């Protein structure tokens, strides 16, 4: 990265997690993060972590980061599950929902008082990654949507990195339901702008104040650009080039950013 990059005027730093601070979830391997977090704190900068991961609760993510020695506060973690639950609460109040997802997403929905149902009526079908998805569950969700339930998806990423390489993410599930019902889901996570808007609102900052740091062009960099936010790519995850993107720069490791504050 060239020295002319100056991040000193940025007030809010947004970070992706997997591929930026660590790799993997069950046995995460730390990439970096401790130095940049401490530096941002010493400069009185704000930071938030934005992850499309909906399978883990905020509590689980927080415990993982602390175990890796990264001094993050619970309220600085914004998962797609948390923001989906918050979005529904802010716009509709407490809702009933049918879950296509895992316990981490259900935990965030419960925090906001939303009521899970397995019956024939639901205000919403809430969709996250579901690694135990069955035909029966998918068919039931589609039937609910055809009967008037609305769909909201945590994100629509195609793949995520798992133990043995790329695995199907939430996107294929969402697309299957959209195809089966002819309806479109509201999407919260990256690269859609809702996650970025909610982060800016929470921090009390404008898009110009913020910088997004991520490892994926398709979600982190493109999503930030769509929201009017500058971005930097880290070369420790999925992508290794910023050619053809609107990223300001690429760094070898997230902790390299301390040189540009």
Annotate the PLM regions.
Residues 53:
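Conserved phosphate/oxyanion-binding catalytic-loop motifs
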Residues 2-27, 33-45, 59-78, 85, ...:
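Asp-based, Mg2+/Mn2+-dependent phosphohydrolase catalytic module
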